[in-house]
């Protein structure tokens, strides 16, 4: 994600988007729970990095638990013009089946708006997401 911004530690990056990144002397290592306007379910993932994102006007997620783009911020990731960038590792799409469905729909409909997507069962992935939420974030399970 960092490469697509304006700069990394004041060195030029690709400058596709207006954000910049700064390397830090500390590491951010934590489990994270996020929300997004794109889907109703929670996003789960894991952070392991030593940089922060600055000047983010188009966040992808809102942090519920865990670190956002920086330790003092609740915004995380970046989305604009069909670009989705995040610091989360996970694997993100496998651990979040509703976000996977959203992402695949967006990807396909961007190129072929009339394409009919065949329904695919993600029952095991959905069960894994529910179990993780129940085991680690039970206060957010309805």
What are these regions (language model features)?
Residues 82-142:
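Acyltransferase
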Residues 36-81:
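Catalytic beta-strand/loop cores that center a nucleophilic Ser/Cys/Thr
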Residues 21-24, 52-55, 91-95:
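Short, acidic Gly/Pro/Ser/Thr-rich loop/turn segments
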